[in-house]
Amino acid sequence: MRKVAVIGVGNSKFGIRNDVTISELAFEAVKPSFEDAGIGAKDVEFVALGSVGAGAWYEELLPAVVTSEYCGLTKAVLVRCEAACASGSAAFFTAYAAIASGHAEVAMALGAEKMREIDSSTSMEWIGRAGYYFWEFHNFGLTFPAYYALYANAHMAKYGTTEEDLALVSVKNHKYGAMNPIAQLKNRITVDDVLASMVIASPLKLYDCCPMTDGAASIVLASEEKVKELKVDTPVWVAGIGYSSGTANLSKRPDFVGLEASVLASQRAYKAAGVTPNQIDFAEVHDCFTIAEIMAYEDIGLCAKGEGAKLVREGQTEIGGKIPVNMDGGLKSKGHPIGTTGCSMIYELTKQLREEAVEKSRQVPLKNYVGLAHNVGGTGHYCYVTILKR
């Protein structure tokens, strides 16, 4: 397998973007990624698009074709990737594999999603189907917050995690999201704000839940030979990728205090990259709900099982702590345009590893120059863990 590097990144403004079409939104990310990489559309041989809501949340049913043509990517081979909320990471892996296997020299992973063109109740119904539709949604009416409320209650019962612990995750992520110019939610909040917010699915409250978001992110990758040819100043190398899947039916899961797919994907990523959790300088984890971030700490080995709440309680996941997590605000504050999130995580990893965080107060200190992105699809139905190294 050939070495592959990230050479260019771009990210649109996240939020309610009814001012643009899906193609225009994608272009907001693609254009700066070209400029960052020092290439043009004609140089890209392969495009993998992560997008979930085609024909449901937004109007286009063939978004890879439509967005690529709008962005001038007329010579590239196209594919759309779907892995629920991990679709962006699936697209990144697919673009990486195209280069690593010798099928392309330059490829793009593009995430583009519009979730706010339809009303909230319809959107929530579609998201609620992100499991086993017949057994869980159709029969029991589980919404997506209700799925993660099951995990939150189980984690509390087994490990003593509290609602205040969950609130601390939200407070941290809003703190850093307020510093991020592309973030959807820029308001700083307190633990009391979280605890006083409306109950969505007990114990999860409004401020425990990520927003529904429109947004796009673009990642340009290149082979080692192309990196040398282009004389890229600061390539960020793909050190390892691990991936795994979980059972469709939640009743077949071993427990509700973590995601087995996250454990397996992280183990495979560490092995592929030849690093240990202690060598990770910072991480982006899938905090669709506050409990998801705490479980992620444990699942990917940042702490022992049952100690995730302690990690955030002690401030260890903030800048200056043991392992900074979600310094862009995470899904909770930056936003969660489902098919885009994985690529947006890679955008943040790349910016941090190049020491280019737009707001310097959220630039993480780097020792090993290694960052990790953990991206979950569904309730652990898919998981990708990507490790980048400068």
Residue ranges with predicted function:
Residues A54-V106, K114-Y147, L185-P211, S244-G246, ...:
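Conserved catalytic cysteine-centered active-site region
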Residues E82-E113, A146-M179, I219-E225, H336-A357:
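Active-site-proximal alpha-helical scaffold in enzymes
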Residues M1-A86, H155-T162, Q184-T190, P203, ...:
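Conserved active-site "lid/cap" helical segment
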Residues I7, S33, V44-V47, G88, ...:
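Buried hydrophobic positions in well-ordered alpha/beta secondary-structure cores of metabolic enzymes
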Residues V20-F27, W57-L61, S89, L142-A149, ...:
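Electropositive phosphate-/nucleotide-binding environments in soluble metabolic enzymes
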Residues A54-L62, L250-D255, D287-K310, P337-G339, ...:
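Short glycine/threonine-rich loop-to-helix capping motif typified by GTGT followed
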